Structure formats: C-alpha cells, structure tokens
Regions:
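RNA substrate-binding interface of SAM-dependent RNA methyltransferases
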Residues: 1-11, 81-85, 91, 99-100, ...
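Class I S-adenosyl-L-methionine
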Residues: 1-68
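Short, hinge-like loop/turn segments at secondary-structure boundaries
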Residues: 7-10, 30-32, 56-59, 83-88, ...
C-alpha cells in the first residue's frame, strides 16, 4: 500500500519475521550482491525495536552492505518524553516477562538501575502485571502507563501503582490498545538484595490464582 501511495510501482518485496531462516536472510543478501538498494520497514514503530530484523542487519553488515538508519517512530521514546520520569538514563526491556518468577527477577534488576526502566505490555495482561508490581514494590516506585501513543485515544496515567490501578479499575474501557510501562525507583525506599527473597515475598502476598494470570 505504501509503495502504491508513493507511486513507486511494484517492487520486489520479501517478508521477514522472527521465524525467517538463514536461507531467507541469504536470499535477501544476494539481492544486494546484485547492486540493488533496499529498505527494511515495519508495520508499526521502528524496525529492530521489539521488532524483527536484528539478525538480518547483522548479517548484512558482515557482508559489507552499507546500513543507513533513518529516524522513525518508537513508542518507548515517545512514552519516556511524556512520562515525567527521569530521562537522563533509561533502559528498555521489551515486553514484561510472562512468568511471575522472571518478572520478579527483572524488577529486582531494575531496582539496581538508577534510571527509568521501560516495558511494553499487552492489554489482557496489564492489570495482572500492575497488581503484582504493586504487591512486590508498593510505593517504592514512580510509575507511568502510556496508552495508544500518537493515536486518538492517547493517554498517560501517572502516580503510584495503586493510583494507576484505581484509575484503570474505575474506567475499564481504557484497558485497550498498546501500553508502555515506565518505572523509576525511589532509591531511598528500595533495598532488595536478590530475586529469591523478592520471589518469596511475592508468594506470601499473592494468591495462586493471581499469579496464574501471568503464566
């Protein structure tokens, strides 16, 4: 559709995904060996940022193909800029882990980072994830949940985890679309020595039913 809109005519298009094989990449690389130019585009956001393409770009570089990276939209930067949380240092983790123990380990790692940690989350897991985060971390974090960025229903929810949960519980119709979670730890409050202790804390506070929501 984009090519037609730009009146570029029918071009050779290769579909590339996380399931693409070495043979698929070699086929694409062979096109560049013929002297053609090409581009990697995404349906949404920026290629390689929680999007396929890392192995392809790496292989292209190994084959001396010149890579030109163009600035484009990415939800994590848009969310960070509008979050009100520190922007001088940040780290991006992709989607929150599905398994509760992995989530605890990740949060434990984030508690040792003196910047803002950024995650993507799906609408059907959002509330369960926030409830677990609240059980584990309570008031030890500053939270921002960004929704449907750059779209008509864009929204930012800021505050403690409890405050954000209250808003979303009262307006469940808002739990739709794409979400970015941003967490900044209050260094004065946080003192977790390891993930195992944090996981034990989780098990003592959260029911098996609640934990299973993330499984």
């Amino acid at each position: 559709k984009l090519l037609n809109k730009l009146k570029l005519g029918r071009k050779k298009i290769f579909t590339y995904s996380d399931h693409s094989t070495v043979a698929d990449r070699n086929n694409i690389i062979s096109q560049f060996d013929k002297g053609i130019s090409g581009g990697l585009i995404s349906d949404a956001g920026t290629p390689l940022i929680s999007d396929p393409g890392f192995k392809l770009v790496s292989d292209l570089i190994l084959n001396n193909v010149n890579i030109i990276s163009l600035p484009g939209p990415t939800a994590l930067i848009t969310a960070l800029a509008g979050s009100g949380l520190p922007t001088d240092k940040f780290q991006f983790h992709g989607f929150l882990p599905k398994k509760n123990k992995e989530l605890v380990t990740t949060l434990n790692e984030c508690s040792n980072f003196s910047g803002t940690s950024i995650f993507f989350e799906t609408p059907h897991r959002l509330m369960a994830s926030l409830e677990l985060i609240d059980q584990i971390l309570g008031s030890k974090i500053h939270l921002c949940v960004a929704k449907e960025l750059t779209k008509i229903h864009e929204n930012f929810f800021r505050g403690t985890t409890k405050e954000v949960l209250k808003i979303l519980n009262e307006k469940k119709e808002l739990i739709k679309g794409e979400f970015v979670l941003l967490i900044n730890f209050d260094e004065k409050e946080c003192d977790y020595s390891n993930a195992d202790k944090l996981f034990e804390n989780l098990e003592s506070k959260v029911s098996i039913r609640d934990i299973s929501k993330l499984a």
